[in-house]
């Protein structure tokens, strides 16, 4: 057909109306790939040879460059390989693995199994087949097990597979007694073994296992690792070891007695141990701080919204046990734990008067005492522990000239309490006043999520307090405007759940306290407004709350490794939870 014939046809077809037919054959891409693969197998039009091990693979540069940035850069840049007709991988990649990658490039399909997943992930990352790397990571996530999680931790760390790393890490923490016996544990790099043994979420109730694991890791390559002994000893909660074991086994260990710094660390732990046994003042040293599995969970509640009792939550027996009456029943207070003590701040009493009182419950001696009152009476506020001190954030106070029950606008004021001197001081105020916000501490900072603003709206902001700079910033916004939510911390992740809307009441998110990024996690088992949450070990626990006229009757547990919520036990119908805290528990020894 000549050009003139086509032009004549165009002029005849110009009737002024638009008549278009878009033809699309959905199977076209697959048929092209199939034919390209056939051409490859017949070595037709191939223009490059890939060598791996003792095998050679003829390929088309254009196909490789289209599915791999590695090959695109190699063939289009000024590298020597851009002119060469051969690329030699030698033994850096197994020929069977390269064959699988090439089959995927020419077919968009690959079979991933337990035998090839790790090698495919490594090769996919090396040659920048990102889809393959991600698919292998997803496969390995679904096949995580206590026997392989250490290997997956190392693999995901080397290849920046974030989700696989996080899940592997959580499984390592949850299965410490299994992984410590694994050969992979002894081969962990120094920074990773320190991070693991020092973690608050490491699940062990016997610090002897942590100590023995540290010594075993050092002894595995004593010549190179002996210098790390002081750092590893500091990961062990030495003052929580049985006294006889600490003084006869640890203090007499030859590796320790021969190293001055290590000897000093153990001597300090012995001093802390004696203070604990003799009840001689507050012990705040890290060596005496229980991990979260060594924490006790306490629930505060009553038969009405007026809270009058403190309960112990027995996680093993799945029971809620009454422990003590609260000296001054109240509602809309905040509760926070520091060490072995529970601090109850503010709230409203039976006469609806707003309180600045602070009551302290010592869980070891099972007795109440009164601390110095806050500077501002408040209710509907949040509280959190940071560096062994207590912070109260926002809330309401009684409005001047109004009935005691009439609230002021949401407060900006933030107070700091030092239990060693029993004194309150004001610190930098919030950027925006809030009440009913979720307040927690993570990575040496305070965070306030959402809440009711000064204008009585739901605030969609994350406010963050830096103690060193004594100032608040707004580093992020919430996925939705929030109030009446609960928050708890696992590592650098802050989990937020519940709320006062149909959607937020059943939703849960996690917030990275370092990158300020949000991720949606599995929904809670029931809609919850004004629920309460704590972390214990490597899990989250949520209790209380209501939605409409429906009260939530279960204590639920979230496993971040599985992204699953389960109901642990039923809360007595006569008990309305008002607060939920996690304290240290020093086991007698």
From Swiss-Prot:
Q: What induces it?
A: By p53/TP53.
* Reported modifications of this chain: Ubiquitinated by E3 ubiquitin ligase complex formed by CUL3 and RBX1 and probably targeted for proteasome-independent degradation. Quinone-induced oxidative stress increases its ubiquitination.
Known CDD domains for this protein? BACK_KLHL37_ENC1 (cd18515), BTB_POZ_KLHL37_ENC1 (cd18267)
- What Pfam families does this protein's entry cite? BACK, BTB, Kelch_1, Kelch_KLHDC2_KLHL20_DRC7
Q: Does the keyword Cytoplasm apply?
A: yes
Tell me which UniProt keywords the record has, alphabetically. Actin-binding, Cytoplasm, Cytoskeleton, Developmental protein, Kelch repeat, Nucleus, Repeat, Ubl conjugation
Enumerate the Kelch repeat regions by residue range.
296-340, 341-388, 389-444, 446-492, 494-538, 539-585
User: What stretches pass through the bilayer?
Assistant: none
Q: Which residues form the BTB domain?
A: 46-114
Question: What broad class describes the main subcellular location of this protein?
Answer: nucleus
Name this protein carries in UniProt = Ectoderm-neural cortex protein 1
């Amino acid at each position: 057909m000549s050009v003139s014939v086509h032009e004549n046809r165009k002029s005849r077809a110009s009737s002024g109306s638009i008549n278009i037919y878009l033809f699309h054959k959905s199977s076209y891409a697959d048929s092209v790939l199939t034919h390209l693969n056939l051409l490859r197998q017949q070595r037709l039009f191939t223009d490059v040879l890939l060598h791996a091990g003792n095998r050679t693979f003829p390929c088309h540069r254009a196909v490789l460059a289209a599915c791999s940035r590695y090959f695109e850069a190699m063939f289009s840049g000024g590298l020597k390989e851009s002119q060469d007709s051969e690329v030699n991988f030698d033994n850096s990649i197994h020929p069977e693995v390269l064959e699988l990658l090439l089959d995927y490039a020419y077919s968009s399909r690959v079979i991933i199994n337990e035998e090839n997943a790790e090698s495919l992930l490594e090769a996919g990352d090396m040659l920048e087949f990102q889809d393959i790397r991600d698919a292998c990571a997803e496969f390995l996530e679904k096949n995580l097990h206590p026997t392989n999680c250490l290997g997956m931790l190392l693999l995901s760390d080397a290849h920046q597979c974030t989700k696989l790393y996080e899940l592997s890490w959580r499984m390592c923490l949850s299965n410490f007694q299994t992984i410590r016996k694994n050969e992979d544990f002894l081969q962990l790099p120094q920074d990773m073994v320190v991070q693991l043994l020092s973690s608050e979420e490491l699940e062990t109730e016997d610090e002897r296992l942590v100590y023995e694991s540290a010594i075993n890791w050092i002894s595995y390559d004593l010549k190179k690792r002996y210098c790390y002994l002081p750092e590893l000893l500091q990961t062990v909660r030495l003052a929580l070891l049985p006294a006889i074991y600490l003084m006869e086994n640890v203090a007499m260990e030859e590796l320790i007695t021969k190293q001055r710094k290590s000897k000093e660390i153990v001597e300090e732990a012995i001093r802390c141990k004696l203070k604990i046994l003799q009840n001689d003042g507050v012990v705040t040293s890290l060596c005496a701080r229980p991990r979260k599995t060594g924490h006790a969970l306490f629930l505060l509640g009553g038969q009405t919204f007026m809270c009058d009792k403190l309960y112990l939550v027995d996680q093993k027996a799945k029971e809620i046990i009454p422990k003590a009456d609260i000296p001054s029943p109240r509602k809309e207070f905040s509760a926070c734990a520091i060490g072995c003590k529970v601090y109850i701040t503010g709230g409203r009493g039976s006469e609806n008067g707003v309180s600045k009182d602070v009551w302290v419950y010592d869980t070891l001696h099972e007795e109440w005492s009164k601390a110095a009152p806050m500077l501002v009476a408040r209710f509907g506020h949040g509280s959190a522990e940071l560096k062994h001190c207590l912070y109260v954030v926002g809330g309401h106070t009684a409005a001047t000239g109004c009935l005691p029950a009439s609230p002021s606008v949401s407060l900006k004021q933030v107070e700091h309490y030092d239990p060693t001197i029993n004194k309150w001081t004001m610190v930098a105020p919030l950027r925006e006043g809030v009440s009913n916000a979720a307040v927690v501490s993570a990575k040496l900072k305070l965070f306030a999520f959402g809440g009711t603003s000064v204008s009585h709206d739901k605030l969609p902001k994350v406010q963050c307090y830096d103690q060193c700079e004594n100032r608040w910033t707004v580093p992020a916004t919430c996925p939705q405007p929030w109030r009446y939510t609960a928050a708890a911390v696992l590592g650098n992740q802050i989990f937020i759940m519940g709320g006062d809307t149909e959607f937020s009441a059943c939703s849960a998110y996690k917030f990275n306290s370092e990158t300020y990024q949000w991720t949606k996690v599995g929904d809670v088992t029931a809609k919850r407004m004004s629920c309460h949450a704590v972390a214990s070990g490597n899990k989250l626990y949520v209790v209380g709350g209501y939605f409409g006229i429906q009260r939530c009757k279960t204590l639920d547990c979230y496993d971040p490794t599985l992204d699953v919520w389960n109901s642990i036990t039923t809360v007595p119908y006569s008990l309305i939870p008002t607060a939920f805290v996690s304290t240290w528990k020093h086991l007698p020894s």
